A protein has these predicted regions:
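A cross-family phosphate/adenosyl-ligand binding-site feature
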Residues: 1-119, 125-398
């Protein structure tokens, strides 16, 4: 996901975290963004304009009446040029000014003139942040359509421990991506995505599971959220970071995933079952650890609930997309699932194909619908996710 052709305006005010914005500016440039920076006068006490000018290739604006550049009404031109504005760190002072329409410097004047999405990341001492006046000002900004990025907690520069830290750079960048990286063509849709493995306990120590890492499902959830959908991510145990802008529903067993999916199904417009749900579980779970003995041991297994098999025949308006992992007869086996479970689409992949399957960042899939099949080339899982969502959007509009 990139920001080619997008202009990001960073507003840096006078907080100790101002230095972090150099990393943000650099990362945004690597994503292809055109980055402009406006600093308050106090911000220049923490980091110099030259740093931002070197990283962005643009003059860093501070003084509204600076004449050392080609004439134009700069606070208006930047307000029109920006696709998104991020004010970070946003001090209590700057937040108060923006909340009350005070435009007494280049930053606040530009923010007031801009009509693009505006993000604000408060960063200050805990006492200042929690002061009712600051909280009222933050609420006012939200009421006017600003997106407020919550502060993080930890040890502050003043050695206090509490909320008020500027979020990590990747969090700020993710908010920018969410605001402008993709058209919001999935806005208004409630999409549920399942991801990762399930774990079926044998005793308090052991369980049956599979090799799924959840990467494909997480990529789908992130892509859908970036495109404006209301996303619920129902997932088994993974080592992946939570997907921002989604409702996170962790589960462990196939039974829990069944309950999580079916309880939300009526309110769901699109269900994408990317999870590797166990087909079988131990028929009985031992209360104590099973001790090793001489000889072999057999474990009786029983079927787990078939999630798509249960809800497929009951669907009304929902679009159902299943996943099929095969090692042979890919299209034949996956097409049978499409018909048997009353699905709208099956995403099939062959574990034996190089670059596909578990634990890698790429995939090779075949999209199977009632109209036929379409094999996609080797792509990143992020690109595969967008291709799947494109197909779903197209078929829902038919």
């Amino acid at each position: 996901m990139d920001l080619n052709g997008k202009c990001v305006l960073l507003g840096v005010s006078g907080g100790i975290a101002a230095y972090k914005m150099a990393n943000v500016a650099s990362a945004l440039r690597k994503l292809g963004a055109d980055v402009e920076v406006i600093m308050t006068k106090n911000a220049t006490q923490f980091i110099t304009p030259v740093t931002f000018e070197t990283l962005t290739g643009h003059k860093c604006m501070v003084d509204t009446f600076d004449r050392d550049f080609k004439f134009e009404v700069t606070h208006i031109s930047l307000a029109k040029k920006a696709d998104v504005i991020l004010v970070a760190p946003a001090t209590a002072n700057v937040i108060a000014k923006m909340a009350h329409g005070i435009a007494d410097d280049m930053l606040t004047t530009t923010v007031l003139a801009a009509k693009c999405p505006k993000l604000v990341s408060p960063a200050m001492n805990t006492g200042m942040l929690e002061n009712p006046i600051t909280q009222d000002n933050i609420a006012t900004l939200e009421r006017y359509g600003f997106t407020v990025i919550p502060s993080e907690s930890g040890v502050l520069a003043c050695k206090d421990v509490g909320s008020g830290r500027l979020p990590k750079e990747d969090v700020l960048i993710e908010h920018i991506l969410h605001a402008i990286a993709r058209p919001k063509d999935l806005a208004g849709l409630c999409i549920a995505v399942t991801a990762g493995p399930t774990q079926e306990p044998l005793d308090p120590v052991r369980y049956l599971t599979n090799h799924s890492t959840g990467k494909m499902g997480y990529a789908l959830a992130r892509a859908a959220a970036m495109r404006g959908a209301d996303v619920t991510l129902i997932h088994g145990e993974t080592a992946l970071q939570p997907v921002k802008f989604t409702t996170d529903v962790p589960v462990t067993t196939a039974q829990q995933m069944y309950e999580a999916v079916t309880s939300r199904f009526d309110a769901t417009d699109v269900l994408i079952m990317a999870a590797a749900v166990a087909d079988y579980r131990p028929a009985a779970v031992a209360n104590d650890k099973i001790k090793k003995k001489d000889g072999d041991m057999s474990i009786p297994l029983e079927r787990t609930p078939d999630i798509l098999g249960t809800i497929g025949p009951k669907k009304t308006h929902q679009f159902l997309c299943g996943f099929s992992m095969e090692t042979r007869d890919l299209v034949e086996n996956s097409s049978a699932k499409l018909t048997k479970k009353n699905l709208d689409m099956v995403v099939a992949n062959n574990l034996k194909v190089a670059g596909a399957g578990f634990g890698v960042d790429t995939n090779v899939v075949t999209l199977i619908t009632p109209d036929g099949t379409r094999e996609l080339p080797l792509m990143s899982k992020a690109d595969v996710a967008d291709a799947i969502l494109d197909e779903i959007l197209k078929r829902r509009s038919q």
